[in-house]
A protein has these predicted regions:
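HotDog/MaoC-like acyl-thioester-processing domains
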Residues: 23-38, 116-256, 322-366
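Short, hydrophobic/amphipathic alpha-helical packing segments
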Residues: 49, 137-141, 298
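Hydrophobic, proline/glycine-rich low-complexity stretches
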Residues: 4, 12-136, 315
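Acidic/His-leaning functional-site neighborhoods
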Residues: 252-333, 337-345
């Protein structure tokens, strides 16, 4: 009996240890979901959209961007150019050490951020227009989930962004605020706008022209051994996920360079060092070169897909996942295939032929 009691005490102690571990980070889930993120206002002028077209032209077969910047008009915002707008304008000291936005971060020790994928729903009735008018992004954290063994936990954060034009009365209310307006006065107007656009039901589009879900994974601090391009030859080879279909719709290879990555970072107002600083990539993150942006992969897949759609067919919903890194100065091959009526599969392959990004698309006919 003495031995049995000893075993029971050990099991109980183990359970207490497990509960203590679970409670060490479990507070992040409700805390992050309760965060009130400030609305992000932007003017939907054609400039950023035009600059992206010009930046991608050398990488897209037969692309012909306009020779001049067009004035604002009722032209719909191209898919997926919403990525170029609605980024917060923070002073540099307010950014995290790696250059990222602190609003989504769990905090220490989860300082390493990776874009895991996302989804986008486009309104069939109220698309955003490049008419120069003021619009807003209402953003919230839908979920924050802790996964992994003790000491190896990761935080998966799902961020919802609802993009919508402002009403004339809302634009007037903001314009009437003096430069010295109090935080309370500003917050009241922002709360009214948030209340009009946000929905508790994440399937309800409401007045949003674009509903985006961004899935970000935060990893714990680690100091990986510095990595060089040659060092990868001696490293264990990861499992390669091969595509499960032929690219019957399109297949196109590009060689991304640092200029493309810089331009996309600039257009998206993204200071994340993994896209800009090769030394940071090698010594802090353990990557052999600059990382190709997850949203840039998404952009190429959407641009190439839309060039292959039938007349009147428009993208309505996209869901995608980033499975493995893509790198600057290494070829990336974008592929697409039909998957039934109004359905398509898109993916990106690395130099090893493995799938690094994959997505599914549903279209509608207008």
């Amino acid at each position: 009996m003495r031995g049995v009691r000893t075993i029971n005490r050990s099991v109980t102690a183990l359970g207490q240890t497990t509960r203590r571990w679970q409670s060490s980070y479990v507070h992040l889930e409700p805390e992050m979901q309760a965060r009130k993120i400030k609305p992000i206002f932007d003017d939907l002028t054609p400039l950023n959209s035009y600059r992206l077209d010009v930046s991608l032209a050398d990488f897209i077969p037969g692309a012909k961007p306009p020779n001049i910047l067009q004035p604002p008009s009722s032209t719909p915002l191209p898919i997926p150019h919403h990525l170029l707008y609605f980024e917060p304008t923070l002073p540099a000291p307010q950014l995290l050490p790696d250059g990222t936005n602190p609003a989504h971060s769990p905090g220490a020790p989860f300082h390493r951020r990776m874009w895991a994928g996302g989804s986008v729903t486009y309104s069939p009735t109220g698309p955003l227009l490049l008419n120069g008018a003021r619009a807003v992004c209402i953003e919230g954290i839908r979920s924050a989930t802790i996964k992994g063994l003790p000491g190896q936990e990761k935080v998966f954060v799902s961020i919802e962004r609802r993009l919508a034009p402002l009403l004339p009365t809302e634009t007037q209310a903001l314009a009437a605020l003096p430069l010295s307006a109090s935080d309370a006065n500003i917050a009241q107007i922002e709360d009214d706008i948030r209340g009009r656009i946000w929905r508790d039901d994440d399937a309800d589009l409401g007045p949003a022209g674009v509903l985006e879900r961004r899935n970000i994974v935060f990893l714990q601090d680690s100091k990986p051994a510095p990595t060089s391009k040659g060092a990868d030859d001696a490293a264990p080879k990861p499992k390669i996920l091969k595509p499960n279909r032929e690219p019957t719709l399109f297949r196109h290879t590009i060689l991304p360079d640092s200029r493309l990555l810089f331009r996309f970072s600039a257009l998206t107002f993204n200071a994340h060092a993994i896209h800009l600083d090769p030394l940071f990539c090698r010594e802090q993150e353990g990557h052999r070169d600059l990382l190709f942006h997850g949203p840039l992969s998404f952009t190429f897949m959407m641009v190439l897909l839309q060039r292959s759609l039938k007349g009147g067919e428009k993208v309505g919903f996209v869901e995608y996942r980033n499975l493995a890194p893509l790198y600057c100065n290494e070829e990336v091959t974008f592929c697409g295939a039909a998957d039934g009526e109004g359905r398509y599969e898109v993916w990106a392959e690395g130099t090893d032929g493995g799938v690094k990004v994959k997505g599914s698309v549903r279209t509608r006919t207008e």
